[in-house]
Amino acid sequence: MAKLNQQYQNLILQIKQDADKFADQQMQTVYKNQKDNLDEIHKYIGMLYIKNAVDGLLKVTPYQKNNILSDLNSKLKDMAKDMGNTEINQVTDILKKNYSDTYYKNAYVMDSGINVNLKFDILKKEYIDAAVNNPLDGQIFSNRIWQNKATVVDKVKQGIVDA
């Protein structure tokens, strides 16, 4: 097997690094959304404590507890839905852009480094969509995101109930 010229190895590595950097930059929107929702939970818990603390302990009747848990469950589900939609939209955009960019950049590097005339067709939208929605480990990424959000809601709710 022929050894790949170091110059082309570096170009291909740079394509990957550029894609990673783009993804990291674009995910900042998702991270901010997650932070905003975390702050909202902290405020909710703080207000709950301020309204119901007696001698430094949270004191609620069983009726109040049921209302609090119902309200908490509703808030957490709304937050998870918001975070899931934000993440899916952002990740979809990142995957589509990176798939397209890396295809064309790699095609250029390969075409410039090989003495054979290669033909790289224009990448059709349906090919990009198929690649983005291709299952990984039996699941498409959006299903994995929704499952992760459901798990987070369950763990946060349980953590608050246990506290």
Task: Locate predicted features.
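N-terminal leader/targeting and assembly helices and adjacent pre-domain segments
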Residues: 1-161
